[in-house]
């Protein structure tokens, strides 16, 4: 059986609001859609943190658990938890094999965390990952820049995923949006 992959996650901080959106498609290999309603965006740490994944589903669940443990260990300090998780992820021979990326955010900070040790905070308050990530990122930047006073963070996140879903075959329109 081939690898199962999940696709597009988009996150935005906008006008004091924050939102994260993910589509629901899980694809096996390059040919078969196995699930349309996967939930790839989750609330962690008593609902104060949002986390979303793109990549191998089983690997992502492992990383969610590991990140949640780090959040508990560092009392909700998002940046410290992300850095410590990235160090552990990169430093462990078995964990390095995990194929997933995470976006994590709270009301003030948004970070991309990868297995190669990167913990990146965007300059513009927008991140997107997964096969449709570049499409969602482009759409989100345009929406934030040109329609910012008319749209909420939730509306920008949802619209960015809808545009990615129109373009990327690995992204569907079953969109889950979480807000903080």
UniProtKB/Swiss-Prot annotation:
Pfam families to which the protein is assigned, alphabetical: Proteasome
InterPro entries: ATP-dep_Prtase_HsIV_su, Ntn_hydrolases_N, Proteasome_sua/b, Proteasome_suB-type
Activity modulation comment: Allosterically activated by HslU binding.
GO biological process, one term: proteolysis involved in protein catabolic process
One GO cellular component term noted in the UniProt record for this chain: proteasome core complex
Function: Protease subunit of a proteasome-like degradation complex believed to be a general protein degrading machinery.
PANTHER family for this protein: ATP-DEPENDENT PROTEASE SUBUNIT HSLV (PTHR32194:SF0), METALLOPROTEASE TLDD (PTHR32194)
Family stated for the protein in its record: Belongs to the peptidase T1B family. HslV subfamily.
Protein name in the entry: ATP-dependent protease subunit HslV
């Amino acid at each position: 059986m081939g690898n199962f992959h999940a696709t597009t996650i988009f996150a935005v901080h906008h006008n004091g609001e924050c939102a994260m959106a993910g589509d629901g498609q899980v694809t096996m290999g390059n040919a078969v859609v196995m699930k349309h309603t996967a939930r790839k965006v989750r609330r962690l740490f008593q609902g104060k943190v949002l986390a979303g994944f793109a990549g191998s589903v089983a690997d992502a669940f492992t990383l969610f658990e590991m990140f949640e443990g780090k959040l508990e260990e560092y009392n909700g300090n998002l940046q410290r938890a992300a850095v410590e998780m990235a160090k552990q992820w990169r430093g462990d021979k078995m964990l390095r094999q995990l194929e997933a990326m995470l976006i994590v955010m709270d009301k003030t900070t948004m970070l991309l965390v990868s297995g190669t040790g990167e913990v990146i905070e965007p300059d513009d308050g927008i991140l997107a990952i997964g096969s449709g990530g570049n499409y969602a990122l482009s759409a989100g930047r345009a929406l934030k820049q040109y329609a910012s006073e008319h749209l909420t963070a939730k509306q920008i996140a949802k619209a960015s995923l809808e545009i990615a879903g129109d373009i990327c075959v690995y992204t569907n329109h079953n969109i889950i949006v979480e807000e903080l």
